[in-house]
């Protein structure tokens, strides 16, 4: 490592060492990422196209029937102002529909940043690149649920 004699040298050395975000695209011109939420794991491929979104072989509006879930899935595209510019194919397994929608959203956000590194700051600011680590708390013995105690009778 270079001789660091001042704070200015330290600043330039750390800037040079910081990894630049590089575009990650496969031979077919697609970016791939995995997203997770609760117990759901989504594998997402993004490529330039007309704006089709396919989840587990179905149109996303058919797979996620509730409008709230559709909105959750489309949030990164809308935030990045790239509506109708990418074709998205996702396979998702595990968990329920809400967790699956969140997993696809997380994977889609990561895939968009791999395809177009300039979108990273916008998606990071929206909180789409952060893995939501909240999972169901385990049930404890001596309790009815995770925290709820059994009914107590004083007399």
Swiss-Prot record:
InterPro entries registered for this protein in UniProt: Ribosomal_Su5_D2-typ_SF, Ribosomal_uS9, Ribosomal_uS9_bac/plastid, Ribosomal_uS9_CS, Ribsml_uS5_D2-typ_fold_subgr
Pfam family, one: Ribosomal_S9
GO cellular component: cytosolic small ribosomal subunit
UniProt keyword annotation of Ribonucleoprotein present: yes
SUPFAM superfamilies: Ribosomal protein S5 domain 2-like
Family matches, as Gene3D superfamilies: 3.30.230.10
One GO biological process term: translation
Keyword Cytoplasm: no
GO molecular function: RNA binding; structural constituent of ribosome
Record's keyword terms, sorted: Ribonucleoprotein, Ribosomal protein
Family: Belongs to the universal ribosomal protein uS9 family.
Family matches, as PANTHER family: RIBOSOMAL PROTEIN S9, SMALL RIBOSOMAL SUBUNIT PROTEIN US9M
The protein's name in its UniProt record: Small ribosomal subunit protein uS9
């Amino acid at each position: 490592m270079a001789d660091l004699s001042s704070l200015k040298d330290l600043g330039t050395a750390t800037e040079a060492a910081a990894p630049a975000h590089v575009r990650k695209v496969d031979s077919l011109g697609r970016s791939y990422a995995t997203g997770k939420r609760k117990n759901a794991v989504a594998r997402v491929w993004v490529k330039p196209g007309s704006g089709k979104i396919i989840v587990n072989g179905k149109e996303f509006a058919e797979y996620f029937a509730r409008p709230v879930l559709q909105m959750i899935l489309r949030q990164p595209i809308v935030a990045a102002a790239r509506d109708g510019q990418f074709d998205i194919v996702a396979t998702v397994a595990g968990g329920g529909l809400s967790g699956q929608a969140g997993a696809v959203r997380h994977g889609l956000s990561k895939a968009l940043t791999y395809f177009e590194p300039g979108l990273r700051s916008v998606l990071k600011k929206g909180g789409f690149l952060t893995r939501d680590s909240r999972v169901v708390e385990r049930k404890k013995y001596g309790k009815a649920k995770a925290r709820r105690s059994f009914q107590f009778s004083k007399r």
